[in-house]
């Protein structure tokens, strides 16, 4: 028996046992008195479907333990086991025993029920956050690209702009929110400005560094062949600086998300951060957790998309770290 087959059988058995035990606890173990409860049918259906999917995946993987399906499952099985243990402990410590005091801690089925109840408002808040982030992030990234390109290519522009970048850039975007509210005409535009500022500094810094690091031999060869300034910038400097620019986009997305969370607390009346703060004000902690979960999924999806774009644009680069 191959080592991978043994690994799949061991971890697969543990995963099935944990998730099976979790399903049994949800359906068979009585709830403690005083705990907040909700219908368990949706949760049981999700876990049951997951168990069927896991069994099917295991059968396919064990049939061809050296194949792609088996490698993918072997890579994910420890996390599947960890998830089963986590949910089992979560269920036992909340609604089944009351070890963790309500209303601060509730069982997963309560979160599912709150998600279903609030899905319309959450969808509206998600779209609002996405639009605000897109507006600010695009504006800030474009401004950072132009600023960094000017500083990297022109010494005169670098003389004037680099001190400004060094002075203003490190200031946290959230610290400028009171000033933005005073100067910018509307609160929504002030929130977009804060998000844009969060993206501008990393993009400008990395673009400048990338353009400055273009090998001089590339430029000399292009000039020898008759290339003008526009060609040198568009066909030599920018492609060569692309890895650094994408790093700036990645870093800028993180700072923009942080700025977005702050801006939504005072600048808009819809958004994921607004929703989380609103339900927290009513001491509705389960809905607060639901908002946090949606926010986490939203942020992860954006990071995955950006890294997919990076991997596609830099497919030629050796030893590229994949997401």
Model-assigned labels for residue ranges:
Residues 1-24, 32-37, 46-81, 307-323:
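Transmembrane alpha-helical segments of polytopic membrane transport and secretion proteins
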Residues 28-42, 92-139:
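Periplasmic/extracellular loop-to-transmembrane helix junction in inner-membrane transport proteins
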Residues 56, 212, 243, 247, ...:
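C-terminal transmembrane helix and the adjacent membrane-cytosol boundary/short C-terminal tail
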Residues 60-66, 135-165:
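Transmembrane-helix boundary motif in ABC transporter permease subunits
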Residues 159-160, 202-249, 272, 276:
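Short cytoplasmic-facing helical segments at TM-TM junctions of multi-pass membrane proteins
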Residues 165-202, 209:
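Generic hydrophobic transmembrane alpha-helix motif, especially the helices
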Residues 182, 210, 258-295, 314, ...:
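Glycine-rich helix-loop "coupling/hinge" segments at transmembrane-helix boundaries
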Residues 193-197, 230-263, 290, 306:
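Transmembrane alpha-helices
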């Amino acid at each position: 028996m191959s080592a991978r087959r043994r690994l799949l059988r061991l971890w697969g058995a543990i995963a099935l046992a944990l998730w099976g035990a979790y399903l049994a606890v949800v359906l068979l173990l009585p709830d403690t008195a005083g705990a907040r409860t909700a219908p368990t049918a949706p949760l049981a259906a999700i876990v049951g479907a997951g168990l069927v999917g896991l069994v099917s995946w295991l059968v396919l993987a064990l049939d061809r333990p050296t194949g792609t399906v088996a490698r993918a499952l072997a890579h994910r099985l420890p996390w599947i086991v960890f998830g089963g243990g986590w949910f089992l402990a979560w269920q036992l410590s909340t609604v089944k025993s009351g070890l963790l005091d309500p209303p601060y801690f509730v069982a997963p089925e309560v979160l599912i029920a709150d998600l279903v109840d609030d899905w319309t408002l959450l969808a509206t808040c998600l779209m609002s956050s996405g639009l605000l982030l897109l507006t600010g992030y695009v504006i800030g990234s474009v401004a950072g690209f132009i600023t960094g390109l000017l500083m990297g290519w022109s010494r005169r522009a670098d003389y004037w702009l680099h001190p400004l970048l060094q002075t203003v850039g490190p200031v946290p975007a959230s610290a400028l929110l009171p000033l933005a509210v005073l100067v910018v005409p509307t609160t929504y535009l002030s929130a977009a400005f804060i998000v844009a500022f969060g993206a501008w500094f990393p993009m400008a810094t990395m673009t400048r560094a990338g353009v400055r690091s273009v090998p001089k031999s590339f430029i000399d060869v292009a000039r020898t062949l008759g290339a003008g300034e526009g060609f040198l910038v568009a066909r030599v400097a920018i492609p060569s600086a692309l890895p650094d620019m994408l790093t700036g986009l990645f870093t800028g997305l993180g700072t923009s998300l942080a700025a977005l969370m702050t801006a939504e607390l005072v600048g808009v009346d819809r958004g994921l951060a607004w929703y989380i703060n609103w339900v927290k004000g009513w001491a509705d902690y389960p809905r607060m957790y639901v908002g946090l979960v949606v926010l986490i999924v939203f942020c992860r999806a954006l990071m995955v998309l950006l890294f997919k774009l990076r991997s596609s644009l830099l497919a030629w680069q050796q030893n590229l770290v994949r997401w």
